[in-house]
Amino acid sequence: MAHKKAGGSSRNGRDSHSKRLGVKRYGGEIIRAGGIIVRQRGTQFHPGDNVGIGRDHTLFAKVDGKIVFAVKGRMNRRTVAVIPS
């Protein structure tokens, strides 16, 4: 009887799905209240005027308006604001 010894099982073969992070609306674009501006891990971008921050650090518009990105303060923080239209 021909026998073949069992091959070892690999410990590879797993991968996580991409999380689709990043800037969703850019400076100068018009956005509706509740619209997502940035999806991020941690605060790469900080909320400015009329921008809220979600539990997962997502930045969203609180009012309808135009998006403005800026670098502010001593720490050169990147902020996102919405100017009401």
Swiss-Prot record:
Gene Ontology MF annotations: structural constituent of ribosome
Gene Ontology BP, a term: translation
PROSITE patterns reported in the protein's UniProt record = RIBOSOMAL_L27
Q: Does the keyword Ribonucleoprotein apply?
A: yes
Q: Which GO terms describe its cellular component?
A: cytosolic large ribosomal subunit
Matches recorded under SUPFAM superfamilies? Ribosomal L27 protein-like (SSF110324)
Keyword Membrane part of the UniProt annotation:
no
Q: Which spans of this chain does the record mark as coiled coil?
A: none
Q: Which family does it belong to?
A: Belongs to the bacterial ribosomal protein bL27 family.
Q: What is this protein called?
A: Large ribosomal subunit protein bL27
The species this protein belongs to is Nitrosomonas europaea (strain ATCC 19718 / CIP 103999 / KCTC 2705 / NBRC 14298)
